[in-house]
Amino acid sequence: PTLATKNTISLWFKRSKFDANQQLYTTNNNAANIIFNRSGASTGPTAAFYTNSGQLLGPRLYRDTSAWMHFVFAFDSTQGTAANRFKVYINGVEETSFNNTAYPAQEASQLGVNGQEIQIGTRANYDRIFDGYMAETAFVDGQALDATSFGEFDSDSGIWKPIDISGLTFGNNGFYLEYKGTGTSANSSGIGADTSGNDLHFAVNGFTAADQSTDTCTNNFATLNPLI
């Protein structure tokens, strides 16, 4: 890795259902887990952000299936203040209220290390599958970035929207998935093609080009509300 003590995960997604635990991002050694947790939430799912030495459990309920959302998870274990080692941004705003907190040790190396297997939209044994849409997924190795590196508020609507991140320095083990390809293999023409320049392409499991949609965070379609 460029620097295993500083990393950033950025995820753009829209949910379709919230009736079960669903995984957004997972590593095989539990260095990072981002999950919608249905357990214990009678009226909707909460979001949980884990590493293998820390966790942030949010109190908010996420029940909107009509809007795109953006999560940024910034990890910086070089910080002397424990609360600054994890930062979470949701739709451009830093989340500071959590039900449970636990922070990693200073100088801990957890994300982006060599040999780390990553699953997006599921976890290692292919359960807790995410039900919804994903438009962009990025991992930045060596920098702890805030949400403004990935999005901005629209001057007319005030809605948080993505910006062009192709100019970011992604680091040695960083990747940028735009899901624009059509193949299922881990190569430059596949759905999981890495366009960061690192060629860290992802293979696709249980998904084909026929499952792709033009509903994106810059072209949002109307959907039925399951709460009504």
Residues of each region from the PLM?
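Predominantly extracellular beta-rich ligand-binding scaffolds that present long acidic/polar faces
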Residues: 96-118
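Short surface loop/edge beta-strand patches of beta-sandwich-type extracellular domains
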Residues: 1-6, 55-63, 123-126, 161-168
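Short, aromatic/His-centered strand-loop micro-motif at the edge of beta-sheets
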Residues: 48-70
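Extracellular glycan-interaction patches encoded by glycine-rich segments
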Residues: 55-57, 110-134
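Short hydrophobic/aromatic patches on beta-strands that form ligand-binding or substrate-lining surfaces
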Residues: 9-17, 71-73, 120, 134-139, ...
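Short tryptophan-centered beta-strand motifs in secreted/extracellular beta-sheet-rich domains
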Residues: 66-77, 88
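Extended recognition patches within non-cytosolic domains
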Residues: 80-82, 87, 96-102, 133-198, ...
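Extracellular glycan-recognition modules
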Residues: 1-47, 79-82, 145-148
